[in-house]
Amino acid sequence: MQSTDLGNKESGKIWHRKPSPATRDGIIVNIIHNTSDYHPKVLRFLNVAFDGTGDCLIAGDHQGNIYVFDLHGNRFNLVQRTAQACTALAFNLRRKSEFLVALADYSIKCFDTVTKELVSWMRGHESSVFSISVHASGKYAITTSSDTAQLWDLDTFQRKRKLNIRQSVGIQKVFFLPLSNTILSCFKDNSIFAWECDTLFCKYQLPAPPESSSILYKVFAVTRDGRILAAGGKSNHLHLWCLEARQLFRIIQMPTKVRAIRHLEFLPDSFDAGSNQVLGVLSQDGIMRFINMQTCKLLFEIGSLDEGISSSAISPHGRYIASIMENGSLNIYSVQALTQEINKPPPPLVKVIEDLPKNKLSSSDLKMKVTSGRVQQPAKSRESKMQTRILKQDLTGDFESKKNELPDGLNKKRLQILLKGYGEYPTKYRMFIWRSLLQLPENHTAFSTLIDKGTHVAFLNLQKKYPIKSRKLLRVLQRTLSALAHWSVIFSDTPYLPLLAFPFVKLFQNNQLICFEVIATLIINWCQHWFEYFPNPPINILSMIENVLAFHDKELLQHFIDHDITSQLYAWPLLETVFSEVLTREEWLKLFDNIFSNHPSFLLMTVVAYNICSRTPLLSCNLKDDFEFFFHHRNNLDINVVIRQVYHLMETTPTDIHPDSMLNVFVALTKGQYPVFNQYPKFIVDYQTQERERIRNDELDYLRERQTVEDMQAKVDQQRVEDEAWYQKQELLRKAEETRREMLLQEEEKMIQQRQRLAAVKRELKVKEMHLQDAARRRFLKLQQDQQEMELRRLDDEIGRKVYMRDREIAATARDLEMRQLELESQKRLYEKNLTENQEALAKEMRADADAYRRKVDLEEHMFHKLIEAGETQSQKTQKVIKENLAKAEQACLNTDWQIQSLHKQKCDDLQRNKCYQEVAKLLRENRRKEIEIINAMVEEEAKKWKEAEGKEFRLRSAKKASALSDASRKWFLKQEINAAVEHAENPCHKEEPRFQNEQDSSCLPRTSQLNDSSEMDPSTQISLNRRAVEWDTTGQNLIKKVRNLRQRLTARARHRCQTPHLLAA
């Protein structure tokens, strides 16, 4: 078996010499992936999948490395690093270079093996995807997780459909049937549905299996033609469903060793048209068994108890099997090599008996039983039977005994003749012949019982005494020795048992049952009387060997005696290691071909023959160390010569000293249960067991006490280390404190210097800030002055415009009055002319004229009233704006004064602090006191200002009330004038005196209100306004007086004009 380590290579050859898989295991190559980092580790393969041709496979490990293995071209390539474990793979897409991989983050990605680029990225699952099934056309794919299955279009990589289920019913598997358009969905409640791929219409549902054989399905497999469905679970039963008839047609029971089925897959055949007959069944023990569904026979199996299989994939053409092993490696098997024995042609009908060489013939060798078996011909339904014919030779006596008959049709005598002729058995059939010679019962149940007892206490630390490189070989040796110790207690105390068993364990490491039974048979037959003087070497057996050596080579024995070399040195090392230390593998196998084919005394004679054949180098040895080295190492000795010498000794040794007279004949192990082995001094073994138990208990007590002492010592050492660490830490802290103190002093000096520089910078900034504030104040005052001057100019312009408009209106009114007077004059003449003719018409006309005049006067008075109101409103607005500006200016002056005062105090404080730095604390307290006083003064000043603001607000409200009263008086005056005009129009000769009185009252009322207003405004003006405010107020009063005088003149003129028509009428 070849083994390939991928290492850190991204490409390379899979095997370096042409693979020749053995029929026994069929392994082409074993692929492992070890990293060559600082801490080497094994990267475990998790999934494997074949492409459509079957000559390429893809595999991913638990770190996300994905490799493509070309079995036809003998190349591997690293095609992708996903940086996370893959949970499922698919390599049979429409585009042959693309593959699908399901990752641990629940996503599915499509990569290209040629360009090594990402083709698409599909998301939608919320749990791990454990299955990817691709349609036969490669157009669709189904990804399955525990909670959902999703159908994808591989042309657009878009999800077409999604299968949702209840949370209580999980999904086991959803997959396409081969060569059809049907989807099969299998759920955890054993329900199986078939769906149409295009329409997702439910085609049928398989019925429930019988209750007597009901199992929970977990794994499924379908034949290539899609007709048969195999299902299995946590049982050794397999259910076979016919999907055409939709019924369960067969239940196959696996061997009792199978308790659960982990994986199922049919083995394709090129000549079965898709109706596969061989089914691979992977069970819980890691062994994949291939059975024929028709005959229910086990054809072959892969994997073992030590190298179990976790998952497998079979190529579409059925040539290769790729298996992920439990240790994380990848094994590739050749199906042709595994089925070589099955596909062998039938044995020939005629057999030829060949004569042995003449010097080997004897009368007992001429009689042979030839049985022609049954010949199977596929074209014929009948089986022809052949009778057994016996070829006999007329010789005296019946030389063949029943004791020479062996299982499986073998004969011990014929095997001995064959062995003498060729010197050894054929390598291909050696194990088979050994099993027949030793008549091994293969007690699986009894051996499993011994194995189930676990590792024996005596062999728990076997690797310390015998450090074996192969861990598998060490485990097999440990299990075999433990089984022997559980079989008989003597073997737990036998120190040389590992040496005796090791060559057989190495030879039968893949079949532990055969290994155990071979060693047990060897101990019962070829190790007779070895344990009678336990724990000493078998003195009686060594005495037999010494007697035979004394008979055949006295000189060599005398040489041993002269140099104080006993049989425990020249015989016992060979026996306890069964010659494995002094012979090569081929020599050892050839020797044991002869040992197992002869009487148990043959082993003892072999020890004598080995010494006799090595007499020349032994006679040249004089030191005991040289003798010990000779019997523990390989020597340049022909094993064929030794075997011939053994046969010579067996024939020429006298009966009285021949070991066969003292040893029993061969006895095979019993069938079903192993025999009891008690050929040892039981009281010694029991005493040793008790003593060993007592010593073990004493050792445990000693170990506990030593552990306690070690714990106490560890605590003391830990406390000492902690104390030393504490003292060191304190010393370091002290030094660090001194360093920090020096650093603090330096930092304080730097801080003082920085503070001085900062104080100087602050002073400079304060001076700059004062200059800037002063400049800003001057700029703001100038801006306010400019705005106020502009406002005054605007007010002057507005007043001028108003005066001009009033003059124009008055002139227009005068012209209107003159025109009216002319009209009246003309009317007067007309009235006087027509008075006598039409008094009534004249009176009517006069009344109409009087109404028109009254309406005109009302309109003019209304317009005049609006003009007066507009003037008063503008005057009030002007006064309000002036007052607000004055208040803001006063507040700005106060804020500036306070800031100047505060800056002056801060400057005084800075000068005082610079003069007396030593009294910093006292000055700070004084500053805080002064600051409190300043704050209190500011609060008081603020309260005063607020009080003054409230007084001003009150005076403002009073001014507004006075203005409202003035408006009301003017309105009342106008109403009185209008009423007087109306009354005058009705009766011009009466009530002239009251009107004059009212005129005086109305003229006096506004003046009084204005005087009151002036008297109310005067005190505040004298208190808070500056000279410019006084000038503004004087200008405003002058303007108001001019407006009042203008109104009086206009009123008097209007009154005079209103009186003229009445006088003329009178």
Swiss-Prot record:
Subcellular location: Cytoplasm, Cytoskeleton, Microtubule organizing center, Centrosome; Cytoplasm, Cytoskeleton, Microtubule organizing center, Centrosome, Centriolar satellite; Cytoplasm, Cytoskeleton, Cilium basal body
Residue span(s) of domain Rab-GAP TBC: 424-599
WD repeats: 33-74, 75-116, 117-157, 158-200, 201-248, 249-296, 297-334
Biased composition (Basic and acidic residues): 989-998
Start-end of Polar residues biased regions: 999-1020
SUPFAM superfamilies attached to this UniProt entry: WD40 repeat-like (SSF50978), Ypt/Rab-GAP domain of gyp1p (SSF47923)
Hydrolase is among the record's keywords: no
PROSITE patterns: TBC_RABGAP (PS50086), WD_REPEATS_1 (PS00678), WD_REPEATS_REGION (PS50294)
Keywords for the protein's UniProt record, in alphabetical order: Cell projection, Cilium biogenesis/degradation, Coiled coil, Cytoplasm, Cytoskeleton, Repeat, WD repeat
Superkingdom per UniProt: Eukaryota
InterPro entries in UniProt: Rab-GAP-TBC_dom (IPR000195), Rab-GAP_TBC_sf (IPR035969), TBC1_cilium_biogenesis (IPR051570), WD40/YVTN_repeat-like_dom_sf (IPR015943), WD40_repeat_dom_sf (IPR036322), WD40_rpt (IPR001680)
Role noted for this protein: Molecular adapter which is involved in cilium biogenesis. Part of a functional complex including OFD1 a centriolar protein involved in cilium assembly. Could regulate the cAMP-dependent phosphorylation of OFD1, and its subsequent ubiquitination by PJA2 which ultimately leads to its proteasomal degradation.
Any GO MF annotation of the entry: molecular adaptor activity
A Gene Ontology biological process term: cilium assembly
Coiled coil: 728-861, 914-948
Record's signal peptide: none
Gene Ontology cellular-component terms listed: centriolar satellite; centrosome; ciliary basal body; Golgi apparatus
Species the sequence originates in: Homo sapiens (Human)
Span list, region Disordered: 989-1020
SMART domains from the UniProt entry: WD40
Region of interest (Mediates direct interaction with PJA2), residue spans: 1053-1056
Name by which UniProt lists this protein: TBC1 domain family member 31
